[in-house]
Amino acid sequence: MKYDFTAIEKKWQEKWLEEKPFTAVTGDKTREKFYGLIEFPYPSGQGLHVGHARPFTAMDIICRKKRMQGYNVLFPIGFDAFGLPTENYAIKNHVHPAIVTKQNIANFTKQLHMLGYSFDWDRVVDTTDPSYYKWTQWIFLQLFKKGLAYKASMPVNWCTSCKCVLANEEVVEGVCERCGSEVIRKEKSQWMLAITKYADRLIDDLDDVDYIERVKIQQRNWIGRSEGTEVDFTATNGDKLTVYTTRCDTLFGVTYMVISPEHPYLAQWKDQLTNWDAVEAYRQEAARKSDFERGELNKEKTGVRLEGIEAVHPVTGKHIPIFVSDYVLMGYGTGIVMGVPGHDQRDWDFADKFGLPIVEVVKGGDVTKCAFALKDDTGIMVNSDFLNGLTVKEAIPVMKKWVTEHGIGRPKTNFKLRDWVFSRQRYWGEPIPLVKCEKCGWVPLPEDQLPLLLPEVKSYELTDDGESPLSKMTDWVNTTCPKCGGPAQRETDTMPQWAGSCWYFLRYMDPHNDKALASKEALEYWSPVDWYNGGMEHTTLHLLYSRFWHKFLYDIGAVPTKEPYAKRTSHGMILGEGGEKMSKSRGNVVNPNDIVAQYGADTMRLYIMFVGDFEQAATWSTDAVKGSKRFLDKVWNLAETAADSEDLTPANEAILHKTIKKVTDDIDTLKMNTAIAAMMTAVNEMTANGVTKGDMGILLRLLNPFAPHITEELWEQLDFAAKTGKMCCQAEWPVYDASKTVASSVEMAIQVNGKMKGTVTVAVDSDEETVKAAALSVDKVQKATEGMQIVKTILVKNRLINLIVKPR
């Protein structure tokens, strides 16, 4: 019978949909729960690609094995469907984003079924569904009520093409992460979320979770906690100039100060600066640059010296110049920095450009040529008055104590992390459920009025003034204040795409609840997510944002755990043939539909796991796909030769138990490629030995998570389904028995006077007399010893026997 993968895969996909063997049962106390999570996809028009298939298949394998091991498994799927690409498509093609989204979700769903994933299809969520975003809005209202959502006027990242504000995390090397267009700085009033209030906990609680180390490192670096000192300099006009430094030991080396172009002092000093026109021109130029461009270490240093105001050094009392320069960002620290050119290369470059003094305060380098930035803290202080002779490590606490006692400084913990720019001037996002009342200010909608629905608009075109398309909907915008009943206007900004993905894993636990985001019972039963796999590119975006929201929900008693995910792993990218990143422009994008049509879903799944180390990038090879198909053909053909016995073939028992251990361990450690290699080796050996149905029963269960369709079909054909009343995916996972990996018999070489005469099979660890008797029963040995006397027997246990003979 031919292996007809098309018919087989269709048959089992329909059967799984009908019989629902992958349904998760909330509250089942008879089984241990396991919650496996993948990052739900954005349903683009291009459909599912191999970049989705790799992590989805891996988690499907993990969850299928867990079910077979007796766990109550929650493995859900949904769609992160708000966002810019759909809105841009709608603008270009004059079609409502909701229609585009519905079509794309239907296509994705078809593809996910096609690949045989064991999702619980009764728990699908869609972030654009009002019954879902009702609770996204509810969470925002709780943040607002607790003072963690606030509006602030600030310089923001403005995409010149998307015409919307971007979070810092969405700007990559000075361009928009989404469209690649130039990002400039623009002053705008924005809704902000105070993620910085959770900065310490977001770092400290990483110690309590099982995340791969590179994820922890990236999050710690992004949050950027540093212990330092705030020091107060004074301007000659009396204003206080506070700086933050981690190296207060270098205070005697300060020869100038730099202020950010956005600092409010500059506008206040307008009439005191004799070169205001030059300062203002520089400020305007800086506003056109992104934070990335301004912060590049290698860029040429620019700036304007303030004429009319200087700074007074707090320790020496000397007057030092103040410059405005764009490398100082208002969003980090205080927006003012002290220049220590002797020991910071950027400061040295600046001082060199503007002819400023360079003072050595840590001995060891030649500061006339470049900064001496010692990497450790053993350098010796010089030119530093009462710090002279101390090491850097000794000098820091001495200076910190000195500035504190003199009332000009204080210890300070600082973070690189900025509050989250939350609002977007777009249409296709969750409406923000607030109104602005002249009398009451910003007022939240009553919770019984949620969801605030996204209204129909005539055009999704962006306004040139940077306002949302919703701002043109005057009938919708104008409303009444829920607090005083007076006239009010709705907020017309919408939430970013990240909003819906901050809590989707909670909704999976109870997706149809209209009274709460999820019931207390469901949250307590399923929390936390046991294993979350996702892309490294989301480490400082979605992963950080969702941890923040979850901690907030924990604080208000809405969820039972401090952390959302117990374990986080990541995967490498699939590259196109030749090792280049897949892209439409290169014409090297692999469509899973094509592979499935030609080779089958099981082959696709098997290959995408066999292609290389899961955590590393791997190069796609269509030729290599054929190898995975040949392996499945071998399994199919082997099953057709199986003897009608449920006993294991003695020659296969050890092979199978070694394979059970290898596959079980490798799935748990994401070594899917070596698990498959072990099964390939086992199939080759079993083909040589011959198999029984009993042998195949173990092999099919091990292979089922990887290739579920073919294994279900063979399980049924070999009568296991009829005998057990279970599909293969419901059968028990094979249990490893170490004693079975030790062979019961061994083949030993037979020598007569050192010359090879044949082999004999005996029980393992047989004694000399047993082996000798068995050897003498072999024809060639009998002929070689005929008429001879055995004078000595040499036995190498389990390997050989050598009979030393002489004529009688």
What are these regions (language model features)?
Residues 2, 15-19, 92-249, 336-456, ...:
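Residue patterns forming the tRNA-binding/recognition surfaces of aminoacyl-tRNA synthetases
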Residues 3-13, 50, 136-363, 467-469, ...:
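NTP-handling and nucleic-acid-processing catalytic cores
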Residues 25-95, 124-139, 245-246, 313-350, ...:
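N-terminal catalytic cores of NTP/NDP-binding nucleotidyl/phosphoryl-transfer enzymes
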Residues 39-48, 120-125, 329-337, 381-385, ...:
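Glycine- and acidic
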Residues 64-72, 92-98, 110, 114-118, ...:
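Secondary-structure transition/capping motifs at alpha-helix termini
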Residues 309-332, 361, 477-616:
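Alpha-helical recognition segments enriched in aromatics with Gly/Pro capping
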